Amino acid sequence: GRQLFWVKISDHPEMDESENRILFTALHHAREPIGMQQMLFFMYYLLENYDSNPYIHQLIDTTEIFFIPCVNPDGYEFNHLVSPNGGGMWRKNRRLNPDNSYGVDLNRNYGYMWGYDDLGSSPVPSSETYRGPSAFSEPEIQMIRDFAQLYDFNLVFNYHAYSNTLLYPWGYITDTTAENPIFKNFAFKLTNYNANAYGPASLMLYLVNGNSDDWYYAGQVNQQRAFSFTPEIGNNMQGFWPSIDQIILLCQDQVEANFLAIRFGSRYGEITQHNKLFFSQNQNFVSFHFKRYGLEEGVTYKVSLLPLSNLIESVGQPVYFNHPELLISYSDSISFSVSKDILPGDEIKILLTLEDDYFTHSDTLTLIFGIPYPIFTDECTTMGNWSSNKWGNNSFVYNSPPSSITDSPVGNYSSNANTSITSTQEFDLTKAKAAVLSFYALWDTERRYDFVQVFASIDQGQHWTALQGKYSSPSSNPLVMDQPVYQGTNLQWVNEEINLSPFTGQKLKIKFALKSNQFINKDGFYFDDISLQIIDKSTGITPSEQNNQLLYTIFPNPANGALHIRPANPHTAQSVQVSIYNIFGKLFLRQSFPSSIRRMDVNLENLPSGVYFISIEAGVEQVQWEKLLISH
């Protein structure tokens, strides 16, 4: 038979360094050449960008990356011989069997649970899934075995086609491994880039014994177990031999997942933060969660803040995670302080950075100083504030009863959907210095292909600008490439916030829009408890100064059954309006009083215990805004 070739990409490929090793293979099955093609594409991408891309440079300098582009050269060449223009359907190698048939399925010839039953492989030589006369009977798989035991990989990717899935053990039984959470977490992250489904091979496709993934994970004697995956590239229409115009697209789909796979095999952590956009104290914190995904043990990760605004006077010390456990979420925070000269509505920017000895990743956080007040709230119990011929209320899924608003109130969204919902009201931000759109959301769409966007328009809907929130992500869909979208699956309500400060000084409308393709239809997007909060330009004092210039004395605070409000200074307004909101901007109580009254009494008996905000308006001007605690 023909030789198998392997390639090593590293900063010193001729040396065996004490670095993490990852293996990519392809073409176990001769009619699945897209696996080899994407591998060659990725190898060229690494080499061509080594000198110009610091991330790729560091990746290659700190990892030994191995490639075996063609595990089955005899079968591949046979297809080339009989179908030189592509399309050959030979699957196995070219062993001559005792019954004069040809071929062994190389992905049924590995030693772990070889021949476990006749469902996951076949004892019949003429079968497409013939496992061979014995485990490791085939020279190709013997070479793979010896190669793997020589280099001791901790992560392996065996590329196949097709079904747009990412498979992992077990294949030989319909069960999961003891370390299924690791496989599942890795697969979830890896498929963010290409929208593939994922799961154990036996549950996603069919039983398969004597396969590569099971052996790498559990069958290597005197070796560390390797987390092994099988990406199945392409959909049913693209098949084993995708058309020429599809090849580059399929190769590009795998690049980011391959990068992440290399990081998983080495050192890799992530930080997430969902801090509220508004803050009101001169001393504050940036809170975050850290999780380690990289398989390398004994690594220290550092999280730090760097001020990017002159209004930030200081930041706290970095936080170190020394030898964190794999996939355990750690919560922490770092303090920062702002100048006493900061004014309500002022924005600050802080760089949040995660680094280890190899890699650095940073995100810029934008925060707004001050206590906002809502100019619009909607509990989404009716469609009164919205215009749409498709979206509507749903009384089964909601953040707060009795309902939410969704793109498909009954069932899943349709194929080729292009639906939207627009606010009937035009929101006036002409006097706002800062503004934030807040809502609760959950969603379930086909990743990459179907998505939801939130838009703003300042010209009555003639033109729309896509808005970026804390939970949106850049799209990889060519229709809206790199635009912020909500895609994939998030089945827990999250409090989304979108900074609308770029639109202050104008009036705007808000729109939610969903688009889908012709294939998979899912439940869609829900939103609930939406509000638009602003800090007014006329608010000329900071929250800390406000306490020294109060126009009204509010007592008691915390309050029980009643709240009393007494003017501290005379004013000329004819009437006073008292409004009480919860922390999400929902209006719970509004009451008006003549300005001549010496004490205003507000009944709180019907308000549940909790944290609220009280707004006092004298005439048309908001003169006081305070936090209120109600405790029955």
Model-derived features with residue positions:
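Metallocarboxypeptidase
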Residues: 80, 85-282
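Residue-level detector of functionally pivotal "anchor" positions at catalytic/ligand-binding pockets or at interdomain
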Residues: 268-280, 372-383, 415-416, 533-555, ...
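Intrinsically disordered, low-complexity Pro/Gly/Ser/Thr-rich segments with frequent PxxP/GP/PP motifs
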Residues: 313-342
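Terminal connector regions
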Residues: 337-372
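Extracellular glycan-recognition surfaces and repeat-rich motifs
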Residues: 375-419, 468-494
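Extracellular beta-strand-rich recognition modules
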Residues: 380, 429-444, 452, 456, ...
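Extracellular carbohydrate recognition
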Residues: 449-451, 516-535
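C-terminal outer-membrane/trafficking sorting elements
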Residues: 545-555, 559-632
